[in-house]
Curated annotation (Swiss-Prot):
Protein name: Elongation factor 1-alpha
Coiled coil: none
Family (UniProt): Belongs to the TRAFAC class translation factor GTPase superfamily. Classic translation factor GTPase family. EF-Tu/EF-1A subfamily.
UniProt modified residues of type 5-glutamyl glycerylphosphorylethanolamine: 289, 362
Lineage: Eukaryota, Viridiplantae, Streptophyta, Embryophyta, Tracheophyta
């Protein structure tokens, strides 16, 4: 065994019928961790149900159904390998909560794969004003997914089949759109594929011999390697807190930045509670250190379960510890609000693992969301499609950071009426020091 392959996360985006499931299913089927026996079972069921289109979407449908029924599917099923990377597919969208997941998402995508329906009418529907293609691309960019691969899918169903003219037309239109969003189209491979027939997915297709660029698999291998933020100070948002007999209090969460190790003195914001980490575990094995991306449980001394909650953030007490946000300024894009938003609006913010009502205290400016130029000072309101800078005040103690320093703690979804009405990235935070914070004996000894 040589060096372990690098892990990357990809998010597959695009309009509802663009063929995301088929394409993703195909990759997982050909390159992935799905057990041959499982595939055979699916194939047999598909045949019994006369699903000729079993092909690959069926694999994904089965996985989703099993996941939704609460059958824990081995997460390996959402993984596949390229020559260079282990790829994990982040929750395939089309899902109501996709936007929320993408933001508070358990993981930030390293690359977006945009699937485009190249058929007549299909492409136009996806890219139209209210098509999801635009929204997904805008979200990916706003949320810091800087690399993108575009797949012109369903090339087997263009008129004529495998039409170069149609491909050229789509590349031109999508490039101009992606450029407006903020991407550099010259750096984006546009791969003509058929997720259904398999053209250019893994091997080069003779049906598309006019195309000289990479296959989808090649394009995934050409993603530039992500830098993991282990050299930043520790930030670990808590997902849950358990009391484990014989061990004590065990907070659980994902290391977003920095490193967590036994013996470290950590501070939990917003309360400022400070204590020593006794041990760190992942998948029931103890670790000498946990890095960004690791989902860990760690045991802390002299702390009651009731003193810690989901949404609290653990940090190193000696290295830029996290603190409560008194208020913060964010760039917000309204994507799905039926009316208009003015000062005093108080929706719920989902940021990392916290879920807290926040007041839009002051709409500071309205900006052009593409260029960032100011359009209006102190606008009366913001409506769908608008972007602006807003000063926000949490209604309860909350921990957030600027997007530039700690990206996973600096992006959020604004939820109202059971849907995501806006997304935002935090530009600056005014912090406040905790008062009367408890420092445990274990932590005092380490001082």
């Amino acid at each position: 065994m040589g060096k372990e392959k690098v892990h990357i996360s990809i998010v597959v985006i695009g309009h509802v019928d663009s063929g995301k499931s088929t394409t993703t299913g195909h990759l997982i089927y050909k390159l992935g961790g799905i057990d041959k026996r499982v595939i055979e079972r699916f194939e047999k069921e598909a045949a019994e149900m006369n699903k000729r289109s079993f092909k690959y979407a069926w694999v994904l449908d089965k996985l989703k159904a099993e996941r939704e029924r609460g059958i824990t599917i081995d997460i390996a099923l959402w993984k596949f390998e390229t020559t260079k990377y282990y790829c994990t597919v982040i929750d395939a969208p089309g899902h109501r909560d996709f936007i929320k997941n993408m933001i508070t998402g358990t993981s930030q995508a390293d690359c977006a794969v945009l699937i485009i329906d190249s058929t007549t009418g299909g492409f136009e529907a996806g890219i139209s004003k209210d098509g999801q293609t635009r929204e997904h691309a805008l979200l990916s960019f706003t949320l810091g997914v800087k690399q993108m691969i575009c797949c012109c899918n369903k090339m087997d169903a263009t008129t004529p089949k495998y039409s170069k003219a149609r491909y050229d037309e789509i590349v031109k239109e999508v490039s101009s759109y992606l450029k407006k969003v903020g991407y550099n189209p010259d750096k984006i491979p546009f791969v003509p594929i058929s997720g259904f027939e398999g053209d250019n997915m893994i091997e080069r297709s003779t049906n598309l011999d006019w195309y000289k660029g990479p296959t989808l698999l090649d394009a995934l291998d050409q993603i530039s390697e992500p830098k993991r933020p282990s050299d930043k100070p520790l930030r670990l948002p808590l997902q849950d807190v358990y009391k484990i007999g014989g061990i004590g209090t065990v907070p659980v969460g994902r290391v977003e930045t920095g490193v967590l190790k036994p013996g470290m003195v950590v501070t939990f914001a917003p309360t400022g509670l400070t204590t020593e980490v006794k041990s760190v575990e992942m998948h029931h094995e103890s670790l000498t250190e946990a890095h960004p991306g690791d989902n860990v449980g760690f045991n802390v001394k002299n702390v009651a379960v009731k003193d810690l909650k989901r949404g609290y953030v653990a940090s190193n007490s000696k290295d830029d510890p996290a603190k409560e946000a008194a208020n913060f300024t964010a760039q917000v894009i309204i994507i799905n609000h039926p009316g208009q938003i003015g000062n005093g609006y108080a929706p719920v913010l989902d940021c990392h693992t916290s879920h807290i009502a926040v007041k839009f205290a002051e709409l500071m400016t309205k900006i052009d969301r593409r260029s960032g130029k100011e359009l209006e000072k102190e606008p009366k309101f913001l409506k769908n499609g608008d972007a602006g800078f807003v000063k926000m005040i949490p209604t309860k103690p909350m921990v957030v950071e600027t997007f530039s320093e700690y990206p996973p703690l600096g992006r959020f979804a604004v939820r109202d009426m059971r849907q995501t009405v806006a997304v935002g990235v935090i530009k600056n935070v005014e912090k406040k020091d905790p008062t009367g914070a408890k420092v445990t004996k274990a932590a005092q000894k380490k001082k």
